[in-house]
Amino acid sequence: MKNIYNTYDVINKSGINFGTSGARGLVTDFTPEVCARFTISFLTVMQQRFSFTTVALAIDNRPSSYAMAQACAAALQEKGIKTVYYGVIPTPALAHQSISDKVPAIMVTGSHIPFDRNGLKFYRPDGEITKDDENAIIHVDASFMQPKLEQLTISTIAARNYILRYTSLFPMPFLKNKRIGIYEHSSAGRDLYKTLFKMLGATVVSLARSDEFVPIDTEAVSEDDRNKAITWAKKYQLDAIFSTDGDGDRPLIADEYGNWLRGDILGLLCSLELAADAVAIPVSCNSTISSGNFFKHVERTKIGSPYVIAAFAKLSANYNCIAGFEANGGFLLGSDVYINQRLLKALPTRDALLPAIMLLFGSKDKSISELVKKLPARYTYSNRLQDISVKTSMSLINLGLTDQEDFLQYIGFNKHHILHSDVTDGFRITIDNNNIIHLRPSGNAPELRCYAEADSQEDACNIVETVLSNIKSKLGRA
């Protein structure tokens, strides 16, 4: 006799929560029953708002992802819904196919979070689910049977259409004389990227492919990855290095010297190349984006793509070409746009390829570093402390809200005072030398993130390392 489960009970006991982008938690908590529960609840909410008979499904390269996808597919089958399984592809490739076919989608991915975790990201037929959708999903009360896991057959249509989305914009192979390194690691799009850049004319050099999952965080690039990029650029005479996080929605791009570009600088350059009228960006992005008169309007939001997407509704009422981007490199196209007189449809989800392609298109007759040098000299940096609970992070933030002097002492900046504070997302302060320090708990993992902005890259890096070092010491982690 099969066990019958209640969705509301299962999720409340699971330890899985919605984070900045999707439901995230420990792999051990993503049991087949929990995956099925989320799937049934998502399906229930979508059926209340849309008409469809199919759900699209894909995964990243985490070892746990395939079994989770099997559980999702089994739950859909029980409810009479067909599953189209696209295998290992980038999240934006799945989103693009989902929106094109007007069907919901589920991406099994933990993105950049630690190896022992994973996640589920959900898409409506018109794009990412909203925070209201998330709330509805966790409150669905429905019954379902214990899922029976079966093998899944892969369709390659989504990968092909994602490549075509970008290659169709360029009648000529504009990367013909460029050498592009692809830092493959375990990225979901590593094979797809090689194909695409070759089709655009580039000589592609494959770098550091890994058979084991590597959780690359584009917002906290390791010293090892920084050193490797510099070595690769020189050794292989590269014009650029392209990589992504695990599920291919956040880009990581280095110039011809192997210097990784900050995600918000990449997003700015892409938006300028697209001639965007207005942009939505999280509060953690470089302040010069707002002050530099690059756009008719800049809307600042909380951190996370759902908040950027929510801002698109406001912007679209007044502006024709709108985009959004984040400090982690995620780029979201909020409106249709023409490139080379060819239509590129909106894709309101994080996409690693568009900013990379537009940067390379903008630098086809020059170097990437030349483009960057034209921007105002204001620099950002970020890093994190792992295994820090939300409770601990919030205690530190609350200290800043209640006693600024003690807070500055705690983080090692007691010789300064605060000129301005912002609590849009966490605690962001401007101190008396115009440097910016920003602390917030990660929405996806038990981590404390620190962002800094200064007039030199060295100063920005030193601020972050000083803050995190002091916090580690105070917490007994030194």
From Swiss-Prot:
<dbReference type="GO" id="GO:0009252">
    <property type="term" value="P:peptidoglycan biosynthetic process"/>
</dbReference>
<dbReference type="GO" id="GO:0009243">
    <property type="term" value="P:O antigen biosynthetic process"/>
</dbReference>
<keyword id="KW-1133">Transmembrane helix</keyword>
<dbReference type="InterPro" id="IPR005844">
    <property type="entry name" value="A-D-PHexomutase_a/b/a-I"/>
</dbReference>
<dbReference type="InterPro" id="IPR016066">
    <property type="entry name" value="A-D-PHexomutase_CS"/>
</dbReference>
<keyword id="KW-0479">Metal-binding</keyword>
<dbReference type="GO" id="GO:0005829">
    <property type="term" value="C:cytosol"/>
</dbReference>
<dbReference type="GO" id="GO:0004615">
    <property type="term" value="F:phosphomannomutase activity"/>
</dbReference>
<keyword id="KW-0472">Membrane</keyword>
<keyword id="KW-0597">Phosphoprotein</keyword>
<dbReference type="InterPro" id="IPR005846">
    <property type="entry name" value="A-D-PHexomutase_a/b/a-III"/>
</dbReference>
<feature type="binding site">
    <location>
        <position position="247"/>
    </location>
    <ligand>
        <name>Mg(2+)</name>
    </ligand>
</feature>
<dbReference type="GO" id="GO:0008966">
    <property type="term" value="F:phosphoglucosamine mutase activity"/>
</dbReference>
<feature type="binding site" description="via phosphate group">
    <location>
        <position position="111"/>
    </location>
    <ligand>
        <name>Mg(2+)</name>
    </ligand>
</feature>
<dbReference type="Pfam" id="PF02880">
    <property type="entry name" value="PGM_PMM_III"/>
</dbReference>
<dbReference type="Pfam" id="PF02879">
    <property type="entry name" value="PGM_PMM_II"/>
</dbReference>
<dbReference type="InterPro" id="IPR005843">
    <property type="entry name" value="A-D-PHexomutase_C"/>
</dbReference>
<comment type="function">
    <text>Involved in GDP-mannose biosynthesis which serves as the activated sugar nucleotide precursor for mannose residues in cell surface polysaccharides. This enzyme participates in synthesis of the LPS group C2 O antigen.</text>
</comment>
<keyword id="KW-0413">Isomerase</keyword>
<dbReference type="Pfam" id="PF02878">
    <property type="entry name" value="PGM_PMM_I"/>
</dbReference>
<comment type="pathway">
    <text>Bacterial outer membrane biogenesis; LPS O-antigen biosynthesis.</text>
</comment>
<keyword id="KW-1003">Cell membrane</keyword>
<comment type="similarity">
    <text>Belongs to the phosphohexose mutase family.</text>
</comment>
<keyword id="KW-0448">Lipopolysaccharide biosynthesis</keyword>
<dbReference type="InterPro" id="IPR050060">
    <property type="entry name" value="Phosphoglucosamine_mutase"/>
</dbReference>
<dbReference type="GO" id="GO:0000287">
    <property type="term" value="F:magnesium ion binding"/>
</dbReference>
<dbReference type="InterPro" id="IPR005845">
    <property type="entry name" value="A-D-PHexomutase_a/b/a-II"/>
</dbReference>
<keyword id="KW-0460">Magnesium</keyword>
<dbReference type="GO" id="GO:0009298">
    <property type="term" value="P:GDP-mannose biosynthetic process"/>
</dbReference>
<feature type="transmembrane region" description="Helical">
    <location>
        <begin position="265"/>
        <end position="284"/>
    </location>
</feature>
<feature type="binding site">
    <location>
        <position position="245"/>
    </location>
    <ligand>
        <name>Mg(2+)</name>
    </ligand>
</feature>
<protein>
    <recommendedName>
        <fullName>Phosphomannomutase</fullName>
        <ecNumber>5.4.2.8</ecNumber>
    </recommendedName>
</protein>
<feature type="transmembrane region" description="Helical">
    <location>
        <begin position="30"/>
        <end position="46"/>
    </location>
</feature>
<comment type="pathway">
    <text>Nucleotide-sugar biosynthesis; GDP-alpha-D-mannose biosynthesis; alpha-D-mannose 1-phosphate from D-fructose 6-phosphate: step 2/2.</text>
</comment>
<dbReference type="GO" id="GO:0006048">
    <property type="term" value="P:UDP-N-acetylglucosamine biosynthetic process"/>
</dbReference>
<feature type="binding site">
    <location>
        <position position="249"/>
    </location>
    <ligand>
        <name>Mg(2+)</name>
    </ligand>
</feature>
<feature type="active site" description="Phosphoserine intermediate">
    <location>
        <position position="111"/>
    </location>
</feature>
<dbReference type="Pfam" id="PF00408">
    <property type="entry name" value="PGM_PMM_IV"/>
</dbReference>
<dbReference type="InterPro" id="IPR016055">
    <property type="entry name" value="A-D-PHexomutase_a/b/a-I/II/III"/>
</dbReference>
<dbReference type="GO" id="GO:0005886">
    <property type="term" value="C:plasma membrane"/>
</dbReference>
<keyword id="KW-0812">Transmembrane</keyword>
<dbReference type="InterPro" id="IPR036900">
    <property type="entry name" value="A-D-PHexomutase_C_sf"/>
</dbReference>
